[in-house]
Amino acid sequence: MSKFGHIHLHTVYSLLDGYCKVKDVVKRAKEYGMNFIGISDHGTLAGIYEFDNACRAEGIKPLIGCEVYFTHDVNEIVKSKDERNEIAWERFLSATGTTDEEYKKTTKKAKLELCKEYLYDTKGYHLILIAKNQTGLNNLIRLTSEANDIAMFNGRGHVDYSLLERYNEGLICTTACISSVVNHNIRTGEIEVAKLHIAKLQELFGDDLYLEIQPLDWEEQVFVNKEAMKLSKEFNVKLIATTDVHYTNKEDDYEHDILLCIGTGKLYKDPNRMSYDHEFWFRTEAEMIDAFNRNNYSDEEHNLYREAMNNTIVLANSVDDNIKVGADKELLPHTEVPEGYNSDSWLSRQCWLGLYKYLTDNNLMDQRRVYEARLKEELDVIITKGFSDYMLIEQAAIKKGTERGFGFGPGRG
């Protein structure tokens, strides 16, 4: 049995970035003796139902998570570029104790140069959130939904501390990759800023906060790992080791590269295109250790790394075993139908009456056998699948919309 499990993993539901097919990566976890595995797709929970089913079919504990995009203020990021520039200019004036009148002859370009350090940071920093219990999953669903509803920027929903404060209950947080709000500031030498974010996240998540380290062969990553180890002691926060899985097999890196080219609209031969180092496959426990051993770490740091690997088990054990993904019952509302009918029989009656009216109005009664056979087949599928109520709801919506003058297409699916 492996003494490590992956909790930072992107499936194909991380659109045009993740290359792990759910069933394949779950089977790989089984092969490697991992009794748990986590999903953390970018900004979406679309894959959790398939993932949960696949894990449970293999006897593996699913950890339901999401790598969310963090911003400093969801209200500001959704403003137009001109509005953000104006806010930056006001900040500049306030900070310098000057007035707009003093710059009335200054060009717009020159103003932007003057206030550039006050421009809003629109980067989407990463954080991983994992449901610890049913409340956590419910909050994660609400959080990602609200992020997409109120804070969409560059096609991605964003969260800030105000949203995390509202929905933090039942959630575990890790500081993700070097693109996280913590690790980015470590990487750029802004250690004190990183400390402020750790303190805030610790306030929100308490003992369920983990500082994430990864055994990648980048100089920047090694630096971040070493600093994270120091900060874990200073703040008494657990470390956790991940490898940011984006594809199942080591040799899948080429296909993953092509996927990135499609996602970014770049040619494979473009030297300036977005590309990952070839380090993001689903590693074994031994490969995780070997990767870390290749770099210049002290004995103490090696021990901390092994502890961080073991903390994947600590995290997994803290998650409830029976978190329910999906509803226990059908959520589709039932429609009211005339006495003596149910949804199936009323839909059938409406369809048959509609068919014969159509055939009569269009002089097609001589071809009715073909139409009757087709309608019977379609009704059989709809009724068998339990979609009669859905069709009746659609009929009512279209009828009401037509009465109000709305146009509708043919609706061929």
Q: What spans do the regions from the language model cover?
A:
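Domain-core and long-helix interface of multi-subunit machines
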Residues: 2-39, 43-58, 93-103, 110, ...
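Non-catalytic structural connector segments
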Residues: 2-3, 68, 81-82, 182, ...
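Short active-site oxyanion
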Residues: 35-37, 126-127, 236, 405-408
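A residue-level signal for conserved active-site and pocket-lining positions in enzyme catalytic cores
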Residues: 41, 62, 133, 140, ...
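Hydrophobic or amphipathic alpha-helical targeting/insertion segments
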Residues: 44-153
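Phosphate/diphosphate-binding loops
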Residues: 61-64, 74-76, 113-114, 118, ...
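A short acidic-Thr-Gly-centered motif at the start of a beta-strand
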Residues: 119-120, 230-236, 397-404
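Conserved phosphate/anionic-ligand binding catalytic regions in large, soluble enzymes, centered on
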Residues: 135-136, 176, 240-249, 401, ...
